[in-house]
């Protein structure tokens, strides 16, 4: 009877049947071996790419990046518009420049104060309602009369 060999685990299974292979492949040790195998393979691929890039750069096949040396003749390359900086000649300053600064990030509220809005990274509650004012919650009237326990046979406890 042929045996099944697992390359990841470097072992033979008792026999070659789908149920034995399925049981083996769902095992903890097999999964760890597969993960380790591919992790080592990725590290080897990354190191190979680094080595090839380094060799090509040293041979002069890859030119140095344009930002690695100062521009010739004092020429200045303007930064992309997405990078904030001082306004360039002939440009209007952005609305946030020259005016009052935006509200800075604040730390946690003092004890007893409730923050307004959801915590950073949190979604608002399901209804989308946000608290209006910090402080204790407001009581709202019940939507229907409160249920008063009654004794069997009594329809109205106040009569």
UniProtKB/Swiss-Prot annotation:
Instruction: State whether keyword Ribonucleoprotein applies.
Output: yes
Q: Where is the composition biased (Pro residues)?
A: 63-92
Q: Which UniProt keywords are listed? A: Metal-binding, Nucleus, Ribonucleoprotein, RNA-binding, Zinc, Zinc-finger
Predominant location: nucleus
BP-aspect Gene Ontology terms = mRNA 5'-splice site recognition; spliceosomal snRNP assembly
Family annotation (InterPro entries): Matrin/U1-C_Znf_C2H2, Matrin/U1-like-C_Znf_C2H2, U1-CZ_Znf_C2H2, U1_snRNP-C, Znf_C2H2_sf
Coiled-coil annotated spans: none
Q: Where is this region: Disordered?
A: 62-94, 140-159
Gene Ontology CC annotations of this record: Cajal body; commitment complex; U1 snRNP; U2-type prespliceosome
- Report the subcellular localization: Nucleus
Q: One MF term from GO for this chain?
A: pre-mRNA 5'-splice site binding
Does this UniProt record's set of keywords contain RNA-binding?
Answer: yes
Give start-end positions of each zinc finger (Matrin-type): 4-36
Q: What does this protein do?
A: Component of the spliceosomal U1 snRNP, which is essential for recognition of the pre-mRNA 5' splice-site and the subsequent assembly of the spliceosome. SNRPC/U1-C is directly involved in initial 5' splice-site recognition for both constitutive and regulated alternative splicing. The interaction with the 5' splice-site seems to precede base-pairing between the pre-mRNA and the U1 snRNA. Stimulates commitment or early (E) complex formation by stabilizing the base pairing of the 5' end of the U1 snRNA and the 5' splice-site region.
**Family assignment?**
Belongs to the U1 small nuclear ribonucleoprotein C family.
Q: Which HAMAP family match?
A: U1_C
**Binding partners and assembly:** Component of the U1 snRNP. The U1 snRNP is composed of the U1 snRNA and the 7 core Sm proteins SNRPB, SNRPD1, SNRPD2, SNRPD3, SNRPE, SNRPF and SNRPG that assemble in a heptameric protein ring on the Sm site of the small nuclear RNA to form the core snRNP, and at least 3 U1 snRNP-specific proteins SNRNP70/U1-70K, SNRPA/U1-A and SNRPC/U1-C. SNRPC/U1-C interacts with U1 snRNA and the 5' splice-site region of the pre-mRNA.
- This protein's name: U1 small nuclear ribonucleoprotein C
């Amino acid at each position: 009877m042929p045996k099944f060999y697992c390359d990841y685990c470097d072992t033979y299974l008792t026999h070659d049947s789908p149920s034995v292979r399925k049981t083996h492949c769902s095992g903890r040790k097999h999964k760890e071996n597969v993960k380790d195998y591919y992790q080592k393979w990725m590290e080897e691929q990354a190191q190979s790419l680094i080595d090839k890039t380094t060799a090509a750069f040293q041979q002069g096949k890859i030119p140095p990046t344009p930002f690695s040396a100062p521009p010739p003749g004092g020429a200045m390359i303007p930064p992309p518009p997405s990078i904030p900086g001082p306004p360039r000649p002939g440009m209007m300053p952005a609305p946030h420049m020259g005016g009052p600064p935006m509200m800075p990030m604040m730390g946690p509220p003092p004890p007893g104060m409730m923050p307004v809005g959801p915590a950073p990274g949190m979604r608002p509650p399901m209804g989308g309602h946000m608290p209006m004012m910090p402080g204790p919650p407001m009581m709202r009237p019940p939507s229907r009369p409160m249920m008063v326990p009654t004794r069997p046979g009594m329809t109205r406890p106040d009569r």
